[in-house]
Amino acid sequence: MNSATPPADSAAFCADLVRSHDFPRYVATLFVPAVERRALLALYAFNVEIVRVRDQVSQPLPGEIRLQWWTDMLSGHAHGSVEGNPVAAELLRAIRDFELPVEPLSLLADEHQFDLYNDPMPTMTALEGYLAATCSALFTLAARIMAPPSEAVEHLARHAGLAQGIAQVITNLPRDAAHRQLFLPQQILDSHDCGIEDVFAGKESSNLRAVLDQLVSEAQQHLATAISLLAEVPPSVRPALLPLSQARADLKRLSRPGRNPFAPQPASRLRTLWTLWRASRSREFTK
């Protein structure tokens, strides 16, 4: 991997990318010192680039090629100039400066190959494995930028990622169903006699509500565990965990009776700012 220092405009590019596509994490970086903030924005911009691949291709093969470029870049075998890609250049700088492990970054990219296909998510265990390799890994890597790694931080990050990831699965249901793709576990759909074609058709039902209620409950349990572990990690890690407060707000919204699961409900940026600012001043992110 090339260790040349990328230009400052690469950092600005990453900041703009994260602000546009992952606003809660962008806001969380506002509570971080400049050096760590630059590394966090590089990490989050990498995640944005990986997640966006699904929406940038119409067939799986071009998506696989794009994801493979990132894994090749991380292993030092990228084709073409890495320095010409501002996100890659910034990510390599963050890896160098904070000794970030490459393997979880590569696994994150690999796991998102699932997004390129319309295969059903078979079980809750499979969903948790997917989220652990993506959302939880992102929390773990962000925490590593803020403080030395520890088992306590990894334990918290796993539950944080599962809580946030399940909330995102429910939030993204309208978009995913419109593309005939579901991250709702087939196992849970079957247990509530909820047909996948009904979900694709945008059909509201008590069966689907039962599925979503079960997932919200799972996410709330992970959220409660993550928050209970906050006291066991260094205070310097807390800014990397601030997106948990947005997950908590999302789960509260998603559990409201009578909510239409197929009606997109984008969060207000002002409300997101308020949520994370209040969380930054609260010991348990809950005020």
Where are these regions (language model features)?
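Catalytic cores of Mg2+-dependent Asp-rich isoprenoid enzymes
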Residues: 1-92, 101-112, 131-140, 150-166, ...
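Cofactor-binding active-site loop characterized by glycine-rich and histidine/acidic residues
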Residues: 98
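Alpha-helical transmembrane segments of multipass membrane proteins
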Residues: 141-145
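Acidic/His metal-coordination segments adjacent to aromatic residues that form catalytic metal sites
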Residues: 113-126, 201-205
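Flexible interhelical turns and helix-capping residues at alpha-helix boundaries
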Residues: 120, 146-150
